[in-house]
Amino acid sequence: MRASLPVHLVVCTQLSAVWFGVAKAHGGHRLEPHVPGFLQGFTDITPAGDDVSANVTSSEPAKLDLSCVHSDNKGSRAPTIGEPVPDVSLEQCAAQCKAVDGCTHFTYNDDSKMCHVKEGKPDLYDLTGGKTASRSCDRSCFEQHVSYEGAPDVMTAMVTSQSADCQAACAADPSCEIFTYNEHDQKCTFKGRGFSAFKERGVLGVTSGPKQFCDEGGKLTQEEMEDQISGCIQLSDVGSMTADLEEPMEADSVGACMERCRCDGRCTHFTFNDNTRMCYLKGDKMQLYSSPGDRTGPKSCDSSCFSNGVSYVDDPATDVETVFEISHPIYCQVICAANPLCTVFQWYASEAKCVVKRKGFYKHRKTGVTGVTVGPREFCDFGGSIRDREEADAVGSDDGLNAEATMANSPDFHDEVECVHTGNIGSKAQTIGEVKRASSLSECRARCQAEKECSHYTYNVKSGLCYPKRGKPQFYKYLGDMTGSRTCDTSCLRRGVDYSQGPEVGKPWYSTLPTDCQVACDAEDACLVFTWDSATSRCYLIGSGFSAHRRNDVDGVVSGPYTFCDNGENLQVLEAKDTE
């Protein structure tokens, strides 16, 4: 029998931490929290007009970028903060805006030399001698040819010749997260939470940017990543009438409740009540209704595997279900995930309509269709890929959820990431040794394989740090993290073999990857074999006497030994030992 392996175990369903844009302890990570920049009030202005702000450390005065100034007699009707400042230059007025908390833009008058520091959204009008500009002309964090036009607007659109004005307007409204500026009609549109699902690349004449000014730390990619973690959760007073999967439990936060849903293979969405702190896991499509204190969200907010502008055309032969009043494509994905016949979904922005489709959809594919979003039934950070779904449907292959697609030598097998959670998934399991940088995911995996006790690893693509881990994975969300098994070798795993009715050891455990079940079994001293059920994502950890409960030709299951395949173990040898 196997040797004793002392490991501290924490099951996935007990996790409560999730990253929502706030720095938290993370297994040895050196955290660099995202903190909005600010400027203190400046104490002096040089005769030349340069800003000597409290945060300027250089001996040379700071040079202000004034490239976004409306120099064509433009003022702003927006409220002025405090009293106008007299007898200053344009440069000094720009510096004054930067020094005043809450200033989003300013108006300077060439004739009167008066400076009006403004708050709120720029409201431009013709003013003799007027020059108006955003708090910052830095556009380094804007992205060209990127559009979020399909996302719902949270503010009235604004017409301006300067894209920097769009950022000033967005910064003034707490509901705005990002803006999109169209150079052709000089119009800004403003988008709120959930915007990331509507991203389109390659749109000529369009620029998008974050609400936070670039020179104060604004990053569009950061906003996107945070939106894909929590942007689709209902803000307040929205519950779900869908039946609960189990008795509700207390949770520390809405993030902790979401994490419980992520760890349960049956869960499609959840409801958390801010007043009672109770967490309700749901296993069917959302049935939203008004409920005081409730906040409801899907298993995942990640929309990175969706495609915008693609349509499969409605067809009774492939349409399984049509649902109206669906406000976001993520909610459409939940409906698809809850329907066993669904392979992909199609969401129409103008009608708030969700159509879920079965196999055979690909032959109706069209591109360049405005206002339509499509995606796979699998949540993006759980391996969902619309491209893989399309390829499988085009050749008439089996459903991508069955066990064949999870095994080596299958057509869609990619050994680099087959056993890796790529969607901002970290592990809180104990880190082995010193945390060091790695040049790639592969190097981090090799480092894990060089450590005798390493069962899995976490690699952060942003910092390049590699964390070899021991014991059972303890998954949670963390930006940039990827977590994988020690090896992607699945040669000793067997499809269709089921030991799930054998003597279970440890607590129920869930994962979307069968290789994680092997890691969990290896970490559980009494576990000899595991069975993974693809339909529920449940890992059955089975102990001595398992061989008497073997069943063959069971659809959707994968079984394997507790030791990794590249160590030479196999089920046949273990079964022989088990019957001795």
Swiss-Prot record:
Gene Ontology BP terms: cell adhesion; effector-mediated perturbation of host innate immune response by symbiont; effector-mediated suppression of host innate immune response; immune system process; proteolysis; symbiont-mediated perturbation of host receptor-mediated signal transduction
Activity regulation annotation text: Lacto-N-biose inhibits binding to asialofetuin, a host glycoprotein.
Summary of the knockout phenotype: Reduced production of IL12 in host cells during infection.
Main location class: cytoplasm
Annotated localization: Cytoplasmic vesicle, Secretory vesicle, Microneme; Host early endosome
Leader sequence residues: 1-25
Apple domain sequence ranges: 68-137, 141-214, 232-301, 305-375, 419-488, 492-565
Any Pfam family hit: PAN_4
Keyword Metal-binding: no
GO cellular component terms attached to this protein's record: cytoplasmic vesicle; extracellular region; host cell endosome; microneme
Protein name in the entry: Micronemal protein 4
Organism: Toxoplasma gondii
Gene name of the record: MIC4
